Amino acid sequence: MAGHSKWANIKHRKERQDAKRGKVFTKWIRELTVAAKQGGPDPASNPRLRLALDKALGANMSRDIIDRAVARGAGTNESDNVEELSYEGYGPGGVAIMVEAMTDNRNRTAAAVRHAFTKCGGNLGTDGSVAYLFERKGQISFAPGVEEDALMEAAMEADADDVVANDDGSFDVFTSFNSFYAVRNALEEAGFKAADAEIVMQPTTSAELDQDGAEKVLKLIDMLEDLDDVQNVYSNAQISDEIMENLG
């Protein structure tokens, strides 16, 4: 059940980039707003909002900012009409890329995403062009120090799909999309406090890159993540730890 996470190095790099750019607050304000709009302002009956609240608090966002974002989403002001969009395309080396965005102007966002793909040697595709290469999964992450056998046993009892041991000693528990919240709650009740928990698009195949290809793909991912309307970027790029170290 346990294995090595091929995509962990890119995920960890993304976390560093997010922190450096200070984009975290903007991302979670949007998520809080949309979650409240779709499922209501009560986190007890809105699991997506409950997860967003946990993320926002974990990013040290003030309760006042959180409350205002939730109130905005629960209101009826049409000027606050933020919608969720996804874009699909191929980057250099044939790497499949999925982009998730939240925007109040889809034309602006589409133009910016297309420009990033074109500038970095990729191609923005049509709906469905790469989505079949990804699965929507729950990912629950635990910091190093967790007892592996106990975590695996608890994960199996909670009907998790997989437990992945990373090189740094951390663990990722993967779930189906529909069972994410149930598994997360079961692990928490079993005494395992997650360092992070999120819904992700996990690639079902990988595209291995050399250093030149990796540099080009990471440039595209960085450019996409820098866009104000972009929430998440996923790829099926497989980059060795050695190349990641060389690229910093």
UniProtKB/Swiss-Prot annotation:
Instruction: Report any Pfam family annotated for this entry.
Output: TACO1_YebC_N
Residue ranges annotated as coiled coil are none
Question: What UniProt keywords apply to this chain's record, in alphabetical order?
Answer: Cytoplasm, DNA-binding, Transcription, Transcription regulation
**UniProt GO BP:** regulation of DNA-templated transcription
Alphabetical list of SUPFAM superfamilies matching this protein: YebC-like
Q: Where in the cell is it found?
A: Cytoplasm
Q: Where is this region: Disordered?
A: 1-21
What do the Gene Ontology cellular component annotations say? cytosol
- List GO molecular-function terms, semicolon-separated: DNA binding
What NCBIfam families does this protein map onto? PRK00110.1, PRK12378.1, YebC/PmpR family DNA-binding transcriptional regulator
Family per similarity comment = Belongs to the TACO1 family.
Can you say what this protein is called? Probable transcriptional regulatory protein PP_1214
Origin species: Pseudomonas putida (strain ATCC 47054 / DSM 6125 / CFBP 8728 / NCIMB 11950 / KT2440)
